């Protein structure tokens, strides 16, 4: 009971942290630029205002690109941290507090310096923005790196990630719901629906307060688990990231396509508030849009597994792009009709979480593709590519948003009534034509260059399994006699009779099979986990004597991509005989027309001259019963 309460406290605290993290990020990446373009400078000269706005935007873009080069240093700094409070929590709490305070400063004119001494203001703005950005990165990297440190249980990690995803989704969308009501409530003047500096300051104050409170909640409510397998992590450099990109063509082309896609959607998303303020003329209605987005986003994510199974990822991706382009087309002619605007905006928004998940899954699959192609596994480096692309795209889209807003006259003092037809046309080119073009470029790259389908990935994983067996078949064995116990309860099957060519032929090593009656899989020998596939259906263990044992649950189960499997171990873990390794659910395997037979082999069985089954084929054997003995010749 105490453990359950502790886990729930940790999940809720981590979800709160994700909520605060995305409230902060949405404010910084989408809404801060609105404050800069419409409220920060009011010199009385529109050209001078636009000049300063573009200078500020250039500073922001340069600093955000610079952050890409700083991030690996931050990651290595966090990796080398060792305090009594843990590795990550000090950075999450400290980074959250400092970044929140500096964000609040950015929503001010620094005591009127922007008027009395614009040059000094720009210098101080750059310094404060850099401090804010660096400490937000420290918090962000530390926060999202915490999950492996909060539990060694794969199942608990998945629950933790689910809680975080919910908190993140709500946080990202609730800002859109609340921003204009808060800004207008605290503003002294309405300014045609865009509020004033006072309103934006108090909005930033609330965001900063949420950032501080949720960061502290993570520090108090979570507990990092000590484990030797978390020590000596490989350090990541930007050079290594680009090296991995160069060696992994699927990752490289997907990253390029995703960058073009992200540039388009980030630009359009950030310009929506401008549309509601300067085209529709009612910024308060923007809350309705993001209220819908919050609900629709959660539903969209929940439908992903079903849609991916029915259409496959690439078809789902193309379908999403088509729906989004349709939404852009309708949005471009919606004018001031709120029902049409909301319909178009939702058509554009609904597929976005699905596209993100498609891209994330292909990037995850490219880990095995890269391993298959180069012979070494670069998991952390491969997965670090997406955040890198997001940041580069975000920096560019911020610059574009500012440029389009200035070109359309949507700066300090502007309102829907002052925007001319020509300026509306320029704005719509930036908001609709440009994103549509970049999304089409991204989709074209994916269509022409991405060949890593689910089926191909399954074959690659099977090939990696085979390579593991071949690579370890020559491992020297110190012991003369080795006995294995059954990893699960079921009926003993002759390995040569199973419906898998590699296992039946003995090319994966000698061993046995079990037709299971239970879903728990235990270690048949003591040793170290040398391989645990991301699909969680196979585990490789090396004993202290050099014996390599492969436990493979099911035939063709790689196609399930982990569905129906729970892993309790990680690569590098030390396990004892009888320790639970996996759990699987046979109904899911059978529902997909697959065989749930558990296959067990000694991949370096060639080092033994003989083996003997201690149980009769066809008879039921209990888990952890002695089942096979390998012997060397005299």
Curated annotation (Swiss-Prot):
Keywords on record: Cell membrane, Kinase, Membrane, Phosphoprotein, Sugar transport, Symport, Transferase, Transmembrane, Transmembrane helix, Transport
The UniProt record lists the keyword Transmembrane: yes
CDD domains with a match to the protein in the record: MFS_MelB_like, PTS_IIA_glc
Residue numbers of Phosphohistidine PTMs: 552
Enzyme Commission no: 2.7.1.-
GO cellular component: plasma membrane
PANTHER family: MAJOR FACILITATOR SUPERFAMILY DOMAIN-CONTAINING PROTEIN, MELIBIOSE PERMEASE
Name of the protein described by the UniProt record: Lactose permease
Species of provenance: Streptococcus thermophilus
Species lineage: Bacteria, Bacillati, Bacillota, Bacilli, Lactobacillales
